[in-house]
Amino acid sequence: MDSLNLNKHISGQFNAELESIRTQVMTMGGMVEQQLSDAITAMHNQDSDLAKRVIEGDKNVNMMEVAIDEACVRIIAKRQPTASDLRLVMVISKTIAELERIGDVADKICRTALEKFSQQHQPLLVSLESLGRHTIQMLHDVLDAFARMDIDEAVRIYREDKKVDQEYEGIVRQLMTYMMEDSRTIPSVLTALFCARSIERIGDRCQNICEFIFYYVKGQDFRHVGGDELDKLLAGKDSDK
């Protein structure tokens, strides 16, 4: 995290506080990544015990989000950070909200798997497992980019979401074909479509975290910007830290 310039602060305690919440974010991110990986495995393998552990573990993710948010509030109230320090605290608060929502997706996947899926649905789950692994890799990579505030890696990950969208669209077409060929599959296909959409949204959450990295490094709000306009903004000079 050299790019965060934590050593510039006169207050060693302020350094420690910033480093602490950054470390907590990475811990929470690792927890969410494991939850998501376990959820995809539980769904694909119809592992009810693993699914139950993921559901139980979601409360730990929620508790961590609250604890980090409270730490951010304390820093703002006590230190009154400015410029890049304030951006960092804001980015951390927004990032943990995205991570918590990804944790919710893992929870929902497991609940759905327990209630709706059985071994007879295995053909429907193969493509969902592939999409899930794709988004897990995106999450892993964006957490790594966040740790280093690596804008080049964030740009690559941001663009990776297009591939996730394409994979999702292919799954939708495949599932619709199942429904048209056999109307008895309609309930299970609708459930699979719900899961596919939930997994696809993880890619969007990772994109949001990329935007937070852009904001921290560049000092500009990149939300709702895409294509050529995004390229132009990212090509600009880095903001003053």
UniProtKB/Swiss-Prot annotation:
GO BP of this protein: cellular response to antibiotic; cellular response to heat; cellular response to pH; cellular response to phosphate starvation; cellular response to starvation; intracellular phosphate ion homeostasis; negative regulation of gene expression; negative regulation of phosphate metabolic process
Mutant phenotype after disruption: Produces high level of alkaline phosphatase (AP) when grown with excess phosphate. No effect on phosphate uptake, but particular deletion mutants have a severe growth defect, which is largely alleviated by a compensatory mutation in the pstSCAB genes or in the phoRB operon. Accumulates high levels of polyP, approximately 400 nmol of phosphate residues/mg of protein. Higher susceptibility to a diverse range of antibiotics including ampicillin, norfloxacin and gentamicin, and stresses such as starvation, acid pH, heat, peroxide, weak acids and energy inhibitors, especially in stationary phase.
Alphabetic keyword roster: Cytoplasm, Pharmaceutical, Phosphate transport, Transport
Localization terms from the record: Cytoplasm
A GO CC term assigned to this protein in UniProt: cytoplasm
GO molecular function: magnesium ion binding; manganese ion binding; protein homodimerization activity
Inducing or repressing factors: Expressed at higher levels under excess phosphate culture conditions. Induced by phosphate starvation via the PhoR/PhoB two-component regulatory system.
InterPro entries linked to this entry: P_transport_PhoU, PhoU-like_sf, PhoU_dom
Gene3D superfamilies (alphabetical): Phosphate transport system protein phou homolog 2, domain 2
Subunit structure: Homodimer.
Protein role: Part of the phosphate (Pho) regulon, which plays a key role in phosphate homeostasis. Encoded together with proteins of the phosphate-specific transport (Pst) system in the polycistronic pstSCAB-phoU operon. PhoU is essential for the repression of the Pho regulon at high phosphate conditions. In this role, it may bind, possibly as a chaperone, to PhoR, PhoB or a PhoR-PhoB complex to promote dephosphorylation of phospho-PhoB, or inhibit formation of the PhoR-PhoB transitory complex. Is also part of complex networks important for bacterial virulence, tolerance to antibiotics and stress response.
Family: Belongs to the PhoU family.
PANTHER family per the UniProt record, alphabetical: PHOSPHATE-SPECIFIC TRANSPORT SYSTEM ACCESSORY PROTEIN PHOU (PTHR42930:SF3)
NCBIfam families for the chain: phoU_full (TIGR02135), PRK11115.1 (NF008332)
Protein name: Phosphate-specific transport system accessory protein PhoU
Organism: Escherichia coli (strain K12)
Source organism phylogeny: Bacteria, Pseudomonadati, Pseudomonadota, Gammaproteobacteria, Enterobacterales
Name of the encoding gene: phoU
